[in-house]
UniProtKB/Swiss-Prot annotation:
InterPro entries: Conotoxin (IPR004214), Conotoxin_mu-typ (IPR008036). This is Mu-conotoxin PIIIA. Residues 1-19 form the signal peptide. Expressed by the venom duct. Mu-conotoxins block voltage-gated sodium channels (Nav). This toxin potently blocks rNav1.4/SCN4A (IC(50)=36-41 nM). It also moderately blocks rNav1.1/SCN1A (IC(50)=120 nM), rNav1.2/SCN2A (IC(50)=620 nM), rNav1.3/SCN3A (IC(50)=3.2 uM), mNav1.6/SCN8A (IC(50)=100 nM). This inhibition is reversible. The block of Nav1.1, Nav1.2, and Nav1.6 is modified when beta-subunits are coexpressed with alpha subunits. It comes from Conus purpurascens. One of its GO terms (cellular component) is extracellular region. The modification 4-hydroxyproline is found at residues 57, 67. It is found in: Secreted. The record marks 63 as: Important for activity. Belongs to the conotoxin M superfamily. The modification Cysteine amide is found at residue 71. It comes from the Eukaryota. Keywords: Amidation, Cleavage on pair of basic residues, Disulfide bond, Hydroxylation, Ion channel impairing toxin, Neurotoxin, Pyrrolidone carboxylic acid, Secreted, Signal, Toxin, Voltage-gated sodium channel impairing toxin.
């Protein structure tokens, strides 16, 4: 009986139950969750910063704004 317990312990250590994929871990489910979060590129902080940086001609001279991304260059 103790040999069976040792074998079971070794098997559980080598292949834990947490290694099995669960239903909530599927990529399709994660995509649906991201879509529900309503995070679009319009609301993304990086996009917002880039738009603010390139909003006026005088801001194109700032160090944060790269001229090749805005001001028609």
């Amino acid at each position: 009986m103790s040999k069976l317990g040792v074998l079971l312990t070794i098997c559980l250590l080598l292949f834990p139950i947490t290694a099995l994929p669960m239903d909530g871990d599927q990529p399709a489910d994660r995509l649906a969750e991201r879509m529900q979060d309503n995070i679009s590129s319009e609301e993304h902080p990086f996009e917002k910063r880039q738009r603010l940086c390139c909003g006026f001609p005088k801001s194109c001279r700032s160090r944060q704004c790269k001229p090749h991304r805005c001001c028609g260059r």
